[in-house]
Regions:
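Short glycine/proline- and charge-enriched loop/turn segments
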Residues: 62-70, 203-211, 252-258
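Conserved N-terminal segment of class I S-adenosyl-L-methionine
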Residues: 1-161, 171-174, 240-241, 266-277
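Conserved catalytic loop of SAM-dependent methyltransferase domains
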Residues: 21-25, 236-263
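Short catalytic micro-motifs in class I SAM-dependent methyltransferases
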Residues: 161-168, 190
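Short, glycine-/aromatic-enriched active-site segment of Class I SAM-dependent methyltransferases
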Residues: 20-25, 189-217, 222-227, 251-252
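Hydrophobic/aromatic residues located in beta-strands of well-ordered beta-sheets
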Residues: 120, 187-189
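A short glycine-rich, Lys/Arg-flanked "PGG" loop and its adjoining helix->strand segment in the class I
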Residues: 171-186
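Short N-terminal helix/helix-N-cap motif within the alpha/beta-hydrolase-1
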Residues: 168-172, 199
Length: 278
């Protein structure tokens, strides 16, 4: 029997089983052949799925994440999400600033924010995405630890959307970002919530979709706050945002499958009110 390895975030060896079963390997309906175990750290509260060696720059990895490594497909999937992200930051907080997007993909957010910023930096290992970023005059580097020292302490705002859950060492990842931020600089970080309420309502059907071979880590608000504090950041503030709308949630409950945004029309007669709480 393999010995328990210390948590890579907090070093604790206190672990329990968070989930055991099939996990998603690619798109909906594609599952791992073998049952997988997601562990819950008793020290920091993070969930952890032991991963295999990963080449983040490979086309095969992008196929598992989004089904394609083509910039055009990335834009089609993600352009519609960017306005809400910009609203969360506020355009005034970006004007004449140095903005760094870590794990930026083909650059949907950077493209939107570029008109406000003094400099935009994209951190992205995928070659096809790097080429698209360079064509749009973003500064491009594959990883934070490969950014030249000239940028150390020069970044005003860093963002990283749905990236940290993919990594083997999230603590080192955040420390690398912090090295590049100026004193008082800000980081906006997003990740799926491991306390997603659909896991309560559909513990079997939704769990095998929620847990993924490409997601090594699973955080709730408390675990994420502990992580950023350990990385040296101060005053973490957590808010909850539903990435997909009410229609997607309702159709999950009815059909037990994802449907995306705006599939079900919830307006109309009856005077119904749908309370929606984070």
């Amino acid at each position: 029997m393999a010995s328990i390895q210390p948590c890579k975030i907090c070093g604790s060896v206190e672990q329990s089983v968070l989930y055991r079963g099939p996990v998603r390997s690619g798109r909906f309906g594609q599952s791992s052949i073998n049952l997988q175990t997601v562990w819950l750290c008793g020290g920091c509260g993070a969930g952890y799925l032991p991963s295999q060696a990963v080449d983040y720059a490979s086309a095969e990895y992008r196929m598992l994440v989004d089904g394609s490594d083509a910039p055009e497909d990335f834009y089609r999937l993600h352009d519609g999400e960017q306005v809400e992200k910009l609203r969360m930051l506020g355009t005034g907080s970006l004007r004449d600033m140095v903005l760094m997007d870590v794990g930026c993909g083909a650059g949907s957010f950077l493209d939107l924010a570029k008109g406000f910023c003094k400099t935009t930096i994209g951190i992205e290992p995928t070659p096809s995405f790097q080429e698209a970023l360079a064509k749009k005059k973003h500064e491009v580097f594959p990883y934070c630890h490969e950014v030249p020292d000239v940028w150390e302490g020069q970044v005003d705002v860093a963002v990283s959307f749905s990236v940290i859950e993919h990594l083997e060492d999230p603590l080192a990842f955040l420390k690398d970002i912090r090295r590049l931020l100026r004193p008082g600089g800000r980081l906006l970080l997003s990740t799926p919530n491991r306390k997603d309420w659909l896991l309560e309502f559909l513990p079997d059907d939704y769990a095998r979709f929620f847990y993924r071979t490409v997601h090594t880590w699973y955080f709730d608000a408390e675990a994420l706050s502990k992580l950023v504090l350990l990385a040296g950041f101060a005053d973490p503030a957590v808010s909850h945002l539903h990435r997909y709308d009410l229609s997607n949630a309702l159709l999950w409950l009815r059909d037990k499958r994802p449907t995306g945004l705006g599939t079900l029309k919830t307006g109309g007669g009856g005077g119904c009110i749908f309370p929606w709480h984070a």
